[in-house]
Each structure stands twice: as C-alpha cells, then as structure tokens.
C-alpha cells in the first residue's frame, strides 16, 4: 500500500460522499461506521494478505456520546491509520492517512491523542465483508441524501 493507492481510495470515498451535492464535511457526518467498513473491504480486496482492523473511539472530541470508527491496516510490520470520514471533524484535511505506526499500541495512543476518548479494536474484517459492501454503500447514500 503506497500513497498513490491511498489517493485512489480517497478519491473513491469523495465520489460517494459528494454524490448528494453537499459539502464534504456534511456528507461525511454519520457515515463513519459504514464508510470505514466499506473502505476496509476495498483494501482487503486489493491486498488479501493484510490485516484490517476497525478501531472504535467512544466519547471522542470531548463530546459525550460521540463515537467514531477508523481503520488500522497492518501491512507487513507497519500500521496505517486511516480515517475515511476525516472531513466531518477537520474540513480542510487533505489526506485520509492519519499516521503510520509500528504497532497497535502506538495506533491506539495516536487515536487517543488525536481524537481523545477511549479507543479499542471493535472488529477485524475478513473476506466475509465483501457480501455487505452494497448494503453499506446504500446506507451511505441514504444518509447523505437525508
């Protein structure tokens, strides 16, 4: 996985989120769960030997009851922290890649410092996620059109 690949993924995300003709930060709101899983599945399709983990943050951004999902992708001995809906919190962010880390503990620490809140691994995606991709896309489209 390299920067060019991540830029391609980012453009796919933006295409979906901008389909409702709303500002990106508005379309990204309330779509982190489905978008994170959808993007994780795209990456898993392209790189079947990597590990795709969903990290869940609770009470993030100093807000009670505000939760958020991001990806921790392990490729070889490197972890990539990716937020497919980063724009809901940071309108002007140019990149979905938050950081590269050496281990999961450092990923959790970064997420806690960046977003605050309590972070944990909520699930690990496998090839079974491919069956739900269309469903997640539909939920995202419904969310951004409402």
Report the location of each language-model feature.
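A structural boundary/capping signal
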Residues: 1-146
